[in-house]
């Protein structure tokens, strides 16, 4: 399993991610996404839809403006992406790694989410 972390969160980032995914060797890509309600969620997800096998949504921890994982999954479904919710990024990674061990996993949708993932995975000193 390979996983990537990207802070992209707007339509231009969605298009850039889609363009990059289109150039990569064939492999299922599963997205873990959390976003803020101040962003264009559909505009971000729509370009990516053709390049991902599934979307797992999370609510960004400790962010008052976070889109709920349920609402984010609904937008994913409206973009024709098979979508499910997870309690957090760790649970999403565990689930995807068990079900799709050879997959590419992209965590994206917010700089706040990216920061959270990086803080959670800092080596202890």
What role is predicted for each listed range?
Residues 115-125:
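Active-site-adjacent alpha-helix immediately C-terminal to a catalytic or transition-state-stabilizing loop
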Residues 24-28, 77-80, 125:
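Short helix-capping segments at alpha-helix termini
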Residues 110:
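Active-site-proximal loop/hinge segments that shape catalytic or ion-binding/gating pockets
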Residues 13, 40-41, 64-66, 93-95, ...:
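Short active-site-adjacent structural elements
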Residues 1-54:
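Nucleotide phosphate-binding/pyrophosphate-handling subdomain across enzymes
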